[in-house]
Each structure stands twice: as structure tokens, then as C-alpha cells.
Amino acid sequence: MSVEWNNPEGGNPIAKGWWPYEQSGYMIDGLYRCGIFLRDSVLMQLGSDNVGYVLSHPRANGMLGPETLGENQWAFSVFARTLLAYYDYTEDDRIPVLLKKHFSALNDTLTNRQTCIIESMCKMYSYTGDKEILQKAGHIWDLFSMNGGTKDNEVFIHGDMVSSKPIDVHGVTAAEVSKQPLILYLYTGRQEYLDAALGSILPWNGKTNFQMGYRLHMKACFLSMRKRCMRPVISVTLYGVTVTC
């Protein structure tokens, strides 16, 4: 049986680790968005039920998600995409309020895939204009990557990213973490973020191998649920950053 983010009563098991919530987060996000475009009430209800339970059961410190996750932000970063899709479709005003409390409760010293919560922080900033959220997102990345980075930083030291130092790390980690500075660049305009993002991509394909058609599409720029149209998609190529509408 899949572990959902929904009510543990009624047969939904409680996982002891973080990875079942990561996997169910992917599943719920995909099925909910699919339900919206197909107007499938069953799939939409799956998303709504999980979102509703998470929003109505915040922890004492304001963080969202099951207590068993502790401060693990990677699994929540995956599920947060469902929260943002739900907000985009319903404009449920609980989401910006509760996500702000969640972000405020975060430890500043997040590392590696935990930093992927930056994606949702920046997206919520785009909705609300709350500069405190954006500033904290930047602060989390700066502590993790800048000035030599943290001791447990796997391969995302700023200087190494800019210089395109070859990396040896889990593929999902490489893809998810390396896009965070690009997302920050979109909302802050800080050149050092763009330099890090572009530099980190080159080792994946080789400096002359982009003719194979590789493009990195930002998950942060997702489909607009309300307007039924495509938001601009940010693509990274050897030739720079392009926007596809």
C-alpha cells in the first residue's frame, strides 16, 4: 500500500523513513495535475484529500508534514509542488499563510537536497511578494554553497560550480540541487547564482556535447492550473537561458 500524506487512519500506513513520502509526493503531484487537466474528479480528490490533511495538521512549531519526517525538507519539497498546484488552481488562502509559517520555522543550515525547499519558497514569493521568504531562501543557499560551503556539502560549493568542476553524485541530487541557484537568479537577479547554475550543468554533457539536444526545464515554472495555459518554461542550453511560451 502506498504511503500518502493523508490521514493515517483508515489504512494509510505511517512510514518510519523519509523516502516513502518522497515517492508518494511525486505520485500525488502528478495525479492531481493530471486530474485537473482531464477534469477527473477521482484524481483531483486524491490531491485535495492529501493537501487538506496536511494543512489541517501543522506541527506545534508551524512546520507542515508528518512528525516522522523531522526536519527533512527533501520529501516535503516534493509534496510542496502539490500545495503550489492546489493554490494555483483553487486560490485557497490557507496555503500562503501556512507555508509562511513552515518557511519561518526552517533551520537556515539546510544541506544538499534539503535546500530544494528554496524552489517552493521562491514560488510562494512570486505569489505574495513577501521579501522575508525570498531573503531566507537566498540565505539558506548562501550558507550551504558560498564561502567554501558547509562541511557536508556534497558537490555544490559555489567556486566548484562556477568553474564546472566534474561531479560524482546521485543523479536526482545533481538535477534538483543545481537548479536552485537558477531559481534564485530568476527572482533576485544576482549574477553569482546564474554563474553557479550554468557552470554546474556543463560537466553533465561536456562543453561541446550540447548538440545532443539536452535542455534543463525548470520545474518551478509549471503549468498554470487556473488559466489552462503554459507558463514560460526556462531552458538552459550552452547558448544561454531561453524562455519558451
What are these regions (language model features)?
Residues 1-245:
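Glycan-recognition and catalytic cores of secretory/periplasmic carbohydrate-active enzymes
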